[in-house]
Amino acid sequence: MANILVCDDDKDIVEAISIYLEQEGYTIFKAYDGMEAINVLRSQPVDLLIIDIMMPKLDGIRATLKIREENPLPIIILSAKSEDADKILGLNVGADDYVTKPFNPLELVARVKSQLRRYTRLGAA
């Protein structure tokens, strides 16, 4: 199964997402800000990233831009920012999908599976 990095400054959200994904057999890495996420990506074999936008130190948008400079992995933004402009910005900076909070955990799991399926099919994984 795939390795997934979940990055959000809300530890409860990270834990909840981790529980759902672990039940599906995924291995979870955790980060609580954008810099931490970049460090995990540089040191661990991660297949997909779920990242929040509004975080301290390095927000999800700037983190996604930096990550895209060196890593083609699928990125799903998970954010309370639900305006169309926010979604468009997230996708334009390199995210592959955008899910708004509050979210349905089962939908998030389905989107993770979909992104991993596409990524694997394209031969990048």
PLM regions: where:
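Acidic catalytic/metal-coordinating carboxylates
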Residues: 32-36, 59-62, 86
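Active-site beta3 strand of CheY-like receiver
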Residues: 43-50
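Charged docking surfaces used in two-component/phosphorelay signaling
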Residues: 15-23
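Basic, amphipathic DNA-recognition helix from helix-turn-helix-like DNA-binding domains
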Residues: 65, 69, 74-125
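Conserved sequence signature across two-component system core domains
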Residues: 7-8, 31, 49, 99
